[in-house]
Amino acid sequence: MKIKTRFAPSPTGYLHVGGARTALYSWLFARHHGGEFVLRIEDTDLERSTPEAIEAIMDGMNWLNLEWDEGPYFQTKRFDRYNAVIDEMLEAGTAYKCYCSKERLEQLREEQMAKGEKPRYDGRCRHSYEHHADDEPCVVRFANPQDGSVIFDDQIRGPIEFSNQELDDLIIRRTDGSPTYNFCVVVDDWDMEITHVIRGEDHINNTPRQINILKALNAPVPMYAHVSMINGDDGKKLSKRHGAVSVMQYRDDGYLPEALLNYLVRLGWSSGDQEIFTREEMIKLFSLGAVSKSASAFNTDKLLWLNHHYINTLEPEYVATHLQWHIEQENIDTRNGPQLAELVKLLGERCKTLKEMAQSCRYFYEDFSEFDADAAKKHLRPVARQPLEVVRDKLSAITDWSAENVHHAIQATADELEVGMGKVGMPLRVAVTGAGQSPALDVTVHAIGKTRSIERINKALGFIAERESQQ
């Protein structure tokens, strides 16, 4: 049997991390078994579905590199198919027209709740032989079995059973002629030959209804696996107050897709004590049997740790392709300065996100108008004038501009003046970067460049002279 899974989001908002994890698990299961992965957009909610949400879902899937083999299919383009199946069910007697008014249904609901009963349709029109005009408004309901039970072997949770007496006759077509979500899903899974439905636990109650419709259609019933929800680190359902919940917001915040995927796969699944997984390892090791039944807690600190790991272990050239977007957001012109791959090497240890990296690299490419006030007050004092003058001259004398030779120039200055390296290094750091923190000074000065470094030292000396004149 060829394994075939699907990810079927509703385009009523962004792709959130819970949906992304479901997509990842479905994708991994298909890839592990050499099967196929289908993307389906469940846009039957015409009022809430938007083109912007569809684009956001596609952007998120593409950024995570969860490529699909079929689709995207859109349910709104398949209404003719759904209605044809409903008409066949009406002919076969597995569905019927219901003419009950909203007022009657509301009264029925209130009476049942007053008795402490679960609200459900009482089947009045199922057994009615009243004549109705062809144009009289009605819905179509599925004639759910009235006895027995539905049992399915959830691939994560084990056997789950529902009594058919708990299930009412589901509306499968509205009065406006549009098919409903639960029915469209069934026909789609049937037509697309889906073998395994992997989705959130909030769909468990839909499953027996969908299985009954499939059986009424003499269609194969797929295997089901329901993934537990994701909570915040406080144990409550994950929401915006816990931080970002949109996949693309994590992109905007400077995370690499590899970090988010690695984090999401471990959010409910494990393989021994292993924490770091390549995509190839995920595909090789993934199984539904190792997915936890319990809710997972989202831990941003752990995700940040993973992101820092990947910034420093992936190829710098690859990381640079993702850094480029953040550089553009900061409006930094990188034509006059180090290559971005070199920047990744320089700042990788110091920066946990690409956004942080982009926001802290401007001095490599652009001159600054003023020094950081605290750093200048502490390190650009009259006592720093001589070390800066000497190191400037030694840097000017370098013919082979390299980090090693820059280091020798700084060391030689300290030796000549018989002072510690900090007496030279800290004023030099503030002079060339404008601030008191940077990567190793020799590689920083080398990356900034000879001409620009000397110009900035002269600017710092001018700052010191002005400071002296005001004393």
From Swiss-Prot:
It is found in: Cytoplasm. GO terms for biological process: glutamyl-tRNA aminoacylation. Keywords: Aminoacyl-tRNA synthetase, ATP-binding, Cytoplasm, Ligase, Metal-binding, Nucleotide-binding, Protein biosynthesis, Zinc. Binds 1 zinc ion per subunit. GO terms for molecular function: ATP binding; glutamate-tRNA ligase activity; tRNA binding; zinc ion binding. The keyword Transcription regulation does not apply. Its main location: cytoplasm. It holds the Pfam family tRNA-synt_1c. GO terms for cellular component: cytosol. It comes from the Bacteria. Belongs to the class-I aminoacyl-tRNA synthetase family. Glutamate--tRNA ligase type 1 subfamily. Catalyzes the attachment of glutamate to tRNA(Glu) in a two-step reaction: glutamate is first activated by ATP to form Glu-AMP and then transferred to the acceptor end of tRNA(Glu). Monomer. This is Glutamate--tRNA ligase.
